[in-house]
Swiss-Prot record:
Catalyzes the reversible conversion of 2-phosphoglycerate (2-PG) into phosphoenolpyruvate (PEP). It is essential for the degradation of carbohydrates via glycolysis. Its cofactor is Mg(2+). The keyword Cytoplasm applies. Keywords: Cytoplasm, Glycolysis, Lyase, Magnesium, Metal-binding, Secreted. The gene is eno. Its EC number is 4.2.1.11. Its main location: cytoplasm. Pfam families: Enolase_C, Enolase_N. This is Enolase. The keyword Lyase applies. PROSITE patterns: ENOLASE. (2R)-2-phosphoglycerate binds at residues 163, 339, 368-369, 390. It is found in: Cytoplasm; Secreted; Cell surface.
């Protein structure tokens, strides 16, 4: 039997040069799993706690030796002798060992590393791909990539307030063609920006981070790049935005301060602006359009746009079934962003996806801005037949690692692989 004989964690670096946790799980059969934990820049108020050491003389306070020690000294002894294929039991033990609502005792970064490494070791023992281990033999849907090609907000040092402007190749016949389309548009955008004398350096997630005249100019420029690459905006390629508006929401006056444009908007005015942008550009998805605590604003946005635009809750739902249940009950949003480190275990992640689907919400599997070479989320996207993945531009190895893993999976699935394109938005009037 694949009993666990050792669980070992170490401190490694993520794509931003900040420390993160890597965990290795060893079994008596020789089956082995390794996982690296991602980290976010714009984080939701209700996310599970990422444990940092706080020692300013070491990695500017961002060290994770406390989380590493929690794995090696507290979690590891408790898992010895466990059957590594008992994912639910392992995750439940991790939750109980921590004993807090937000995983603040052991750290979500410690717990998640163990949860993912155990899943990899189990797949290794069974000699099947990770996506198949996690999702079974019906796991065959390749996701539509949501590719962040213009970065702003917390992800870039520029004057753009909206954090992410993305493209979605919904008209592609399969995943590899979708990736090709995205890559060609990315290169086309580079030449468009260059011709305008704009900066073509990339941000945390591989997208470009130019200074633009307005947030709308980002949409205009992307449409120009899509056409220059030879594709039809709206028909073959849709646009998506992640406003991450909690980052520019002012709690004191309850308004949205778009400092890049020098304007201040109320919730209703933000909704008006989104409605105007949707009428002018082929936008199919808006994430965190309003502050995570502005439930009235989110409800208004859902009433106005929820039938024709995917309204994704990231900071709003933080991959948490309690927050999602509240959203479903109040008619807020129609989609959830899934980030494994927001909740801390694979079991809880899959519970959130299941709840979303039962309620008719879509689920978008997502990276974080601080990523690694770990490609687990690619397997999760296929395992859950989620239909969408958000993992940055086709640039930077930490982003491309996920796309390359999806190419491998599509190859393995061969003629059984499915790519639903526009039909991934099954709850919209398309």
């Amino acid at each position: 039997m694949p009993y666990i004989v050792d669980v070992y964690a170490r401190e490694v670096l993520d794509s931003r040069g900040n420390p993160t946790v890597e965990v290795e799980v060893y079994t008596e059969t020789g089956a082995f799993g390794r996982a690296l934990v991602p980290s976010g820049a714009s984080t939701g108020e209700y996310e599970a706690v990422e444990l940092r050491d706080g020692d300013k003389d070491r990695y500017l306070g961002k060290g994770v030796l406390t989380a590493v020690n929690n794995v090696n000294e507290i979690i590891s002894p408790e898992l010895l002798g466990f059957d590594v294929t008992e994912q639910n039991a392992i995750d439940q033990l991790l939750i109980e060992l921590d004993g807090t609502e937000n995983k603040g005792k052991l750290g979500a970064n410690a717990i998640l590393g163990v949860s993912m490494a155990c899943a990899r070791a189990a797949a290794d023992f069974l000699q099947i791909p990770l996506y198949q281990y996690l999702g079974g033999f019906n796991s065959k849907t390749l996701p539509v990539p949501m590719m962040n090609i213009v970065n702003g907000g917390e992800h870039a040092d520029n004057n753009v307030d909206i954090q992410e402007f993305m493209i979605m190749p919904v008209g592609a016949p399969n995943f590899r063609e979708a990736l090709r389309m995205g890559a060609q548009i990315f290169h086309s955008l580079k030449s468009v920006l260059s011709a305008k004398g704009m900066n073509t350096a990339v941000g945390d997630e591989g997208g470009f981070a130019p200074n633009l005249g307005s947030n709308e100019e980002a949409l205009q420029t992307i449409v120009e790049a899509i056409e220059k690459a030879g594709f039809k905006p709206g028909e073959e390629v849709k646009l998506a935005m992640d406003a991450a508006s909690s980052e520019f929401y002012n709690k004191e006056d309850g308004k949205y301060h778009l400092s890049g444009e020098g304007v201040v908007k109320t919730s209703a005015e933000m909704v008006d602006w989104y409605e105007e942008m949707v009428s002018k550009y082929p936008i199919i998805s808006i994430e965190d359009g309003l502050d995570e605590n502005d439930w009235e604003g989110h409800k208004l946005l859902t009433e106005r746009l929820g039938k024709k635009v995917q309204l994704v809750g990231d900071d709003l739902f933080v991959t948490n079934t309690k927050k999602l249940a509240e959203g479903i009950k109040n008619g807020v949003g129609n989609s959830i962003l899934i980030k494994v480190n927001q909740i801390g275990t694979l079991t809880e992640t899959f519970d959130a996806i299941e709840m979303a689907k039962r309620a008719g919400y879509t689920a978008v599997i997502s990276h974080r801005s601080g990523e690694t070479e770990d490609s687990t989320i690619a397997d999760i996207a296929v395992a859950t037949n989620a239909g969408q993945i958000k993992t940055g531009a086709p640039s930077r190895t930490d982003r491309v690692a996920k796309y390359n893993q999806l190419l491998r999976i599509e190859d393995q699935l061969a003629e059984t692989a499915q790519y639903h394109g526009i039909n991934s938005f099954y709850n919209l009037n398309k």
